[in-house]
Amino acid sequence: MIQLKNVSKIYDNGTVGLKDINLNIDKGEFIVVVGLSGAGKSTLLRSINRLQDVSEGDIIIDGKSITSAKGKDLREIRRDIGMIFQSFNLVKRSSVLRNVLTGRVGYYPTWKTTFNLFTKEDKQKAYEALQRVDLADKVYTRADQLSGGQQQRVAIARVLTQNPKIILADEPTASLDPQTSRRVMHDLKMLNEEYGMTVVANLHSVELAKEFGDRVIGVRAGQIVYDGKMSETSQAVFDDIYNGGNGKKGEEDA
């Protein structure tokens, strides 16, 4: 489903974000990516969705190159990829419902979504998504009146409304307390198991990675240094991922 072929990313100042990455991700996997801050985890996810261009190599999504896609082709590929960010990326002054409905924007011309011309079916999808994350009672609440955990669950409902094949979650629990973090991860696991969505999540917490990941990818200094089943991954492997390098930060925040 997702193929990275000899992918490298070098920033303008010479910092290496990714170095010769080769990776295959199959449909329906729940993958956690771990490593020090600056190791290349966020660069990896942002490259898959082409939020940034790679310097070398190719990224294939369902047989189509997102690296070279343009215009309509690029929009169609991205429509199948949902993003969840550490900072939630909600419109704070808008209602929860309006934020969740933005998951449908990839299906319409810009002018329709600008004027909030969503269909009754879209609104029903949004409401059902909020039910799945236990926030149906917050439909008309402004996003900035919610707790951090609730805002992240709104972001998950938005992704569910989008109905993508792939979810890329970039440190989705970094700013949350342990209990709320676990709830957010349970919601992501629900999307994976019940809807068949492929999930790739960057995590700082090794504990959460062990609890929810089926496969773990270790990243250090822009390179994949480990790739294996979680059930076969020892604590010593995690220790090596985090301590085996010099830990220098690159030009990214995770």
From Swiss-Prot:
Disulphide linkage map: none
Catalytic activity, EC: 7.3.2.2
Localization (cell): Cell membrane
Limits of the ABC transporter domain: 2-246
Residues given in the record as ATP binding sites: 35-42
Any one GO MF annotation of this record: ATP binding
SMART domains: AAA
Source species, domain of life: Bacteria
GO CC, any one term: plasma membrane
First-listed, main subcellular location of the protein, grouped into a coarse class: membrane
One of the Pfam families matching this protein, by short name: ABC_tran
Enzymatic reactions: phosphonate(out) + ATP + H2O = phosphonate(in) + ADP + phosphate + H(+)
UniProt KW keywords: ATP-binding, Cell membrane, Membrane, Nucleotide-binding, Phosphonate transport, Translocase, Transport
Enzyme class: translocase
InterPro entries in UniProt: AAA+_ATPase, ABC_transporter-like_ATP-bd, ABC_transporter-like_CS, ABC_transpr_PhnC, MetN_ABC_transporter-like, P-loop_NTPase
Membrane association type: Peripheral membrane protein
Subunit structure, as described in the record: The complex is composed of two ATP-binding proteins (PhnC), two transmembrane proteins (PhnE) and a solute-binding protein (PhnD).
Family the entry assigns: Belongs to the ABC transporter superfamily. Phosphonates importer (TC 3.A.1.9.1) family.
Known role: Part of the ABC transporter complex PhnCDE involved in phosphonates import. Responsible for energy coupling to the transport system.
NCBIfam families, alphabetized: ABC_phnC
Protein name (record): Phosphonates import ATP-binding protein PhnC
